[in-house]
UniProtKB/Swiss-Prot annotation:
Subunit structure: Component of the large ribosomal subunit (LSU). Mature yeast ribosomes consist of a small (40S) and a large (60S) subunit. The 40S small subunit contains 1 molecule of ribosomal RNA (18S rRNA) and 33 different proteins (encoded by 57 genes). The large 60S subunit contains 3 rRNA molecules (25S, 5.8S and 5S rRNA) and 46 different proteins (encoded by 81 genes). uL22 is associated with the polypeptide exit tunnel.
Source organism of the structure: Saccharomyces cerevisiae (strain ATCC 204508 / S288c) (Baker's yeast)
Superkingdom assignment: Eukaryota
Annotated protein name in UniProt: Large ribosomal subunit protein uL22B
Disulfide bond residue pairs: none
């Protein structure tokens, strides 16, 4: 089994999926992954569908130079956002795969959330483009490795009601003692 970037605290309650050497932009895919990190699986899938329909956008926080602004970024507190369709489709495929793996393990699909998602750079694929005056420039693509882990949410245990301990200052203690002496 391949090694993941994060180890699950409870492997019996989590499922994983990964894709290697995927021909999809590393920068766009990284921003897409960060947008859904920590989200519930159903919410993340619905959000990515809305991104494909241009109803919502992916916020670009790190790789955002020379990116246009859109009002759809306000939802996330940013001005720069995009709709990277190819990256969204690859991430959707991995989410679907992780959901199927979780179902095979017998996990409850309604309780799943994205506990870990990581995008790494794969080796560049090199080509060449021919320029004026007999020059040649490199023409590289930036593929990605994507890994994600979905985990079943655990039931939150309510804390026991703690007894409220009233702390009195020395002045308050003295006043109470004086009142007891007067009334006694």
């Amino acid at each position: 089994m391949a090694r993941y970037g994060a180890t699950s605290t409870n492997p019996a309650k989590s499922a994983s999926a990964r894709g290697s050497y995927l021909r999809v932009s590393f920068k766009n895919t990284r921003e897409t992954a960060q947008a859904i990190n920590g989200w519930e699986l159903t919410k993340a899938q619905k959000y990515l569908d809305q991104v494909l329909d241009h109803q919502r956008a992916i916020p670009f926080r790190r790789f955002n130079s020379s990116i246009g602004r859109t009002a759809q970024g306000k939802e996330f507190g940013v001005t720069k956002a995009r709709w990277p369709a190819k990256s969204v489709k690859f991430v959707q495929g991995l989410l679907q795969n992780a959901a199927a793996n979780a179902e095979a393990k017998g996990l409850d699909a309604t309780k799943l959330y994205v506990s870990h998602i990581q995008v790494n750079q794969a080796p560049k694929q090199r080509r060449r483009t021919y320029r004026a005056h007999g020059r040649i420039n490199k023409y590289e693509s930036s593929p990605s490795h994507i890994e994600l882990v979905v985990t079943e949410k655990e039931e939150a245990v309510a804390k026991a009601a703690e007894k409220k301990v009233v702390r009195l200052t020395s002045r308050q203690r003295g006043r109470i003692a004086a009142q007891k002496r007067i009334s006694a």
